[in-house]
Amino acid sequence: MNNRIGDNLFHFGANEELLRALLEEGVKLVVIGGLAIAWHCPERQADDMDLLVEPTVENSARIAKTLTKLQIAGFSSTSFSKPGLQIPLKHIYYAELLTPQQEAPSFSEVEAKAVDAKLFNLPIRLASISTLIGMKKRAIQSATEQLEKHAKDIELLEKISS
């Protein structure tokens, strides 16, 4: 099943409630990840809904207010104002809220390149192809560094286990 039908994306049904509530509260966000890729490449089946949110105190307060209305507790008005956050909302929704990594393009840069799209027939901003390529390249680099670190750890442990 494709996530894109015409000029509209569809996804896990409960995510519509989350997205609608965030947009109604005026949360600044850009759809990223597999769902954004599915917009550009309809053959791509998306997994969860990844939303990049602007990491400002004002936007963070709007996010916290929205989550409280949706019965998701534990977030303060500054919870989403830090870089590099990845907050899964997987108990009720199949989504994650993320803030840009320190070394990655800022929210403003991602938003400036974003394209207009629809998700659940709601107007949204969606990451551009060039932004998504950059994000995927950073993910590969990070994974490669982690693999190298683990390989070195195994090598060190094997030396002392002989």
Regions found by a protein language model. Name each.
Residues 1-162:
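Compositionally biased terminal segments of proteins
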